[in-house]
């Protein structure tokens, strides 16, 4: 806690500007974009899964999942939507509202929302932090399975070493500094 993990994730995803250096994605410094182009780039290239789920209670599960696409003026690919919601086990929950779901179900909705726009990168900030052990393991397995199946890069911020051990690459941060970088 307080080591800079979430700050790093926010900088990598363009939510916060770095105080120095560049953030290159596909060789392009994303902070060279105008604010409007940055917003479009994030909507089309990045998905986000937060510890607090960040679902809108006044919208149905379906509308929460489709929100990033709608903000971009796009409609969901109905076949892909059906595939994602089935894979996540929420296909029967689409007409419900977030407050009617368990924490694990809400996190699956957040995962579906992050995947539906077919982003290249999914950023997950402590995605298991508010879940019990079983729901947390299920969430990690679903995130990993979805990223593998849909060819996405998954970047997870966690303080849980058991979660970190499942990663292809582990970057350890202490007091805002990278202290190890392992493949």
Mark where each language-model region is.
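ABC family nucleotide-binding domain
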Residues: 1-166, 170-172
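H-loop (His-switch) and adjacent beta-strand-loop-beta switch element
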Residues: 170-182
């Amino acid at each position: 806690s307080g080591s800079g993990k979430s700050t790093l994730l926010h900088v990598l995803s363009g939510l916060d500007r770095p105080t120095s250096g560049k953030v290159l994605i596909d060789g392009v410094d994303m902070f060279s974009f105008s604010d409007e182009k940055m917003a479009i780039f994030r909507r089309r290239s990045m998905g986000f899964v937060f510890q607090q789920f960040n679902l809108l209670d006044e919208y149905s599960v379906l509308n929460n999942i489709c929100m990033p696409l709608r903000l971009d003026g796009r409609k969901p690919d109905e076949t892909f939507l059906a595939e994602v919601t089935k894979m996540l086990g929420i296909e029967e929950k689409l007409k419900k509202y977030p407050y009617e779901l368990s924490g694990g179900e809400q996190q699956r909705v957040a995962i579906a929302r992050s995947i539906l726009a077919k982003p290249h990168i999914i950023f997950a900030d402590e995605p298991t932090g508010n879940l019990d052990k079983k729901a947390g393991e299920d969430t990690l397995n679903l995130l990993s399975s979805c990223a593998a199946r849909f060819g996405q890069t998954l970047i997870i911020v966690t303080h849980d070493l058991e979660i970190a051990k499942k990663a292809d690459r582990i970057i350890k941060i202490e007091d805002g500094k990278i202290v190890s970088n392992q493949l």
